């Protein structure tokens, strides 16, 4: 007899075996499901408040995806040895899970819902995001909370003309596509992808393929609910106050229709605030008791009805455009005098100032991920301060939205970046959104590409991005190019497409309704290509190609190779040699384990000097070669002479001159410069030198110290450069 009512479902999903269970762990949560995909194990829990907070006018869903270091057999770093603030990957995965779940909660359901996902075990080859999304959907499904799911999800790769279902990390690295799609049995709700300039048909095919394959997971969730699901909540939306709706419509509809004739955002926003206040005041005068939140919801529905109706009727959009027109574009490059690269990209009332900075390998971001530590040479940071929308607000660390928008823009640009061996710089792009009225992430893509080109980064092609919208009513639909912020809020689909002339590099899609077909998506993608090509034309006209020279303020770099065994000599004891080198030459020096050395500096002379000194430190002494040496120490039987950095040899007393030498001090002194020939090197690295052999070969001479003030070898023909090492 067990105290648990444990339900387990197993199914084969592509190349992976999936195990899904509920009823044993986290039983006090509204719903809890563990999903195990070949040792990647996640626990998703859901808890919902029994009633909404007073005055609540939105659905308060929170999703927290948490990676535990013990999942990979690690102990956290730092002083406290605990997991700290969410990593960028945790934030992005939380958003990935939130986006397909949120539209499926019924309208009017305002109870707090919290979804928490813990990664308990990680197989480095199996990413945890798809298991986490499946587990979250299953936990909601078994909880009985009002939810129009379940949701399925799949990752799709593309290689050699074939789609790959839930590829491993190794397969993703070799794939031309990394696409995540989520949806219900009937409809796609969310797409997130990065691609290597693939066509619209290939991208749409991947979405359809992923939706077909996720049905296996959806069916397994249905089976789990049948055996282990909790009773469904007895919940119904609050009845609509038809009398209030009629009164608010009577007062507000004509005013709102007038407001939406204003084409400028700030004027329209000001007018809308006035209308909301006017409606509240007139209701109070009429003695109508009404909750402010309820009135606001009615007015919002009226706004949506006006905007959607105008567009579906073929009337101009909010700002006067038709459905296909892109807003006016203005581009300016080299905006900031000391930055390595910069561009100001303005499209209508959306504006991004994007700045590129070049650095060395030591500037790479080191990411301590669960699957293993790695380095990232390309960073893109997106910031949108409140003034961009004419508002006041908090300024500080980036919010989830900013991290997500930055990641989307980064995905769009990665496929056109040069490889490390072609352009060894670390690159950081910062997109400062200075104005926003829709599509700021796509403005970051356009401005980011131009800033890279302004910095002299040899990108493979121009990349442009455009945000698209869709309005669907029954069998009628309209696709909108380059949407405004209001069109985003009032529409049924928001999708962003970025790419080059050759194809798509990033696609993000969020769908709020379940009636969007493959044919509608096909029309939308074709119209998005039209908009993208228009923007690419404007960008190519403003900057046809990347600058051939870097900014005067950017570091220059040279690369050299040494034997890995010599690395320790370049670094020196406790780093003394490398520290002295960087300080004295004004350079930054990075040394890789394979012996690759990168020297960076704004000074060409400093780089050349650092390279010369490293070559000297790592040079191998060659038997038969003549070197310019320095006498370091006199011995009874000879002298120690330095011929290369870290390379000392013995000049025996018999190898100074042909005649017999009674006292070495008669011929040499410490600090004296002499030319010596390396005549022997044994297996232990001990070197034997000869001064007389060098004199004979070069035709020089040396005099005893007692007979002259300059006891050095007589001038001879200059040695070749390799002898001067």
Swiss-Prot record:
This is Polyribonucleotide nucleotidyltransferase. GO terms for biological process: mRNA catabolic process; RNA processing. PANTHER family: POLYRIBONUCLEOTIDE NUCLEOTIDYLTRANSFERASE, POLYRIBONUCLEOTIDE NUCLEOTIDYLTRANSFERASE 1, MITOCHONDRIAL. Its cofactor is Mg(2+). GO terms for molecular function: 3'-5'-RNA exonuclease activity; magnesium ion binding; polyribonucleotide nucleotidyltransferase activity; RNA binding. The keyword Cell cycle does not apply. Keywords: Cytoplasm, Magnesium, Metal-binding, Nucleotidyltransferase, RNA-binding, Transferase. Residues 624-692 form the S1 motif domain. Residues 555-614 form the KH domain. Involved in mRNA degradation. Catalyzes the phosphorolysis of single-stranded polyribonucleotides processively in the 3'- to 5'-direction. GO terms for cellular component: cytosol. Gene3D superfamilies: GHMP Kinase, N-terminal domain, K Homology domain, type 1, Nucleic acid-binding proteins. InterPro entries: ExoRNase_PH_dom1, ExoRNase_PH_dom2, ExoRNase_PH_dom2_sf, KH_dom, KH_dom_type_1, KH_dom_type_1_sf, NA-bd_OB-fold, PNPase. It comes from Cupriavidus metallidurans (strain ATCC 43123 / DSM 2839 / NBRC 102507 / CH34). Mg(2+) binds at residues 488, 494. Belongs to the polyribonucleotide nucleotidyltransferase family. Residues 706-725 have a biased composition (Low complexity). It catalyses: RNA(n+1) + phosphate = RNA(n) + a ribonucleoside 5'-diphosphate. Residues 702-725 are annotated as: Disordered. Its EC number is 2.7.7.8. It is found in: Cytoplasm.
């Amino acid at each position: 007899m067990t105290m648990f009512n444990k339900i387990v479902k197993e199914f084969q999903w592509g190349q992976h075996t999936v195990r899904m269970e509920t009823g044993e762990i986290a039983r006090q949560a509204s719903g809890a499901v563990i999903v195990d995909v070949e040792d990647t194990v996640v626990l998703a829990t859901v808890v919902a408040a029994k009633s909404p907070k007073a005055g609540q006018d939105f659905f308060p869903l929170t999703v927290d995806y948490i990676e535990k270091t013990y999942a990979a057999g690690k102990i956290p770093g730092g002083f406290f040895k605990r997991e700290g603030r969410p990593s960028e990957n945790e934030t992005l995965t939380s958003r990935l899970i939130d986006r397909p779940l949120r539209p499926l909660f019924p309208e009017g359901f305002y109870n707090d819902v919290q979804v928490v996902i813990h990664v308990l075990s990680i197989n480095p080859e199996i990413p945890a995001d798809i298991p986490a999304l499946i587990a979250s959907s299953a936990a909601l499904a078994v909880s009985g909370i009002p939810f129009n799911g379940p949701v399925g999800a799949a990752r799709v790769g593309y290689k050699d003309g074939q789609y790959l279902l839930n590829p491993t990390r190794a397969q993703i690295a070799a794939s031309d596509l990394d696409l995540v799609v989520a949806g219900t049995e009937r409809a796609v709700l969310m797409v997130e992808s990065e691609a290597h300039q693939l066509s619209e048909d290939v991208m749409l095919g991947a979405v359809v393929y992923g939706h077909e394959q996720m049905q296996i997971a959806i069916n397994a969730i249905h089976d789990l609910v049948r055996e282990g699901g909790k009773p469904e909540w007895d919940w119904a939306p609050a009845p609509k106050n038809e009398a209030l709706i009629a009164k608010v419509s009577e007062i507000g509809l004509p005013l709102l229709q007038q407001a939406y004739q204003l084409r400028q955002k700030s004027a329209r926003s000001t007018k809308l605030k006035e209308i909301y206040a006017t409606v509240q005041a007139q209701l109070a005068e009429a003695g109508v008791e009404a909750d402010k939140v309820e009135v606001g919801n009615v007015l919002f529905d009226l706004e949506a009805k006006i905007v959607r109706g105008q567009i579906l009727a073929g009337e101009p959009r909010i700002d006067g455009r038709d459905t296909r027109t892109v807003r006016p574009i203005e581009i300016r490059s080299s905006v900031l005098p000391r930055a390595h690269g910069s561009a100001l990209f303005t499209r209508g009332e959306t504006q991004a100032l994007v700045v590129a900075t070049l650095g060395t390998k030591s500037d790479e971001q080191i990411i301590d991920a669960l699957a293993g530590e790695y380095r990232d040479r390309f960073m893109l940071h997106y910031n949108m301060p409140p003034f961009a929308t004419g508002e006041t607000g908090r300024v500080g660390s980036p919010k989830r939205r900013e991290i997500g928008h930055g990641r989307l823009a980064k995905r769009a640009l990665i496929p056109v970046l040069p490889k490390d061996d072609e352009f060894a710089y670390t690159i950081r792009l910062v997109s400062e959104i200075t104005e926003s009225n829709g599509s700021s992430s796509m403005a970051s893509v356009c401005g980011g590409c131009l800033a890279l080109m302004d910095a002299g980064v040899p990108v493979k092609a121009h990349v442009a991005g455009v945000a698209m919208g869709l309005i669907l009513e029954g069998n009628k639909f309209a696709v909108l190019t380059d949407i405004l912020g209001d069109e985003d809020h009032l529409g049924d689909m928001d999708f962003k497409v970025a790419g080059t002339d050759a194809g798509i590099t990033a696609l993000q899609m969020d769908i709020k309704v379940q009636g969007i077909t493959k044919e509608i998506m096909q029309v939308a993608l074709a119209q998005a290509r039209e908009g993208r090509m228009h923007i690419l034309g404007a960008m190519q006209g403003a900057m046809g190609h990347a600058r051939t020279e870097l900014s005067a303020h950017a570091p220059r770099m040279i690369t050299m190779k040494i034997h890995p065994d010599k690395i320790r000599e370049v670094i020196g004891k406790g780093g003394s040699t490398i520290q002295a080198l960087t300080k004295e030459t004004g350079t930054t020096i990075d040394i890789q384990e394979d012996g690759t050395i990168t020297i960076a500096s704004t000074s060409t002379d400093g780089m050349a000097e650092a390279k010369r000194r490293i070559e000297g430190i790592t040079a191998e002494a060659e038997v038969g070669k003549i070197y310019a040496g320095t006498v370091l120490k006199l011995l009874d039987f000879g002298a120690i002479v330095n011929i290369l950095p870290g390379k000392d040899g013995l000049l025996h007393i018999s190898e100074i001159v042909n005649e017999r030498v009674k006292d070495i001090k008669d011929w040499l002194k410490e600090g004296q410069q002499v030319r010596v020939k390396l005549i022997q090197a044994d297996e232990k690295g001990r070197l034997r030198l000869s001064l007389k052999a060098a004199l004979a070969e070069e035709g020089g001479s040396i005099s005893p110290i007692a007979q002259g003030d300059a006891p050095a070898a007589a001038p001879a023909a200059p040695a070749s450069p390799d002898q001067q090492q």
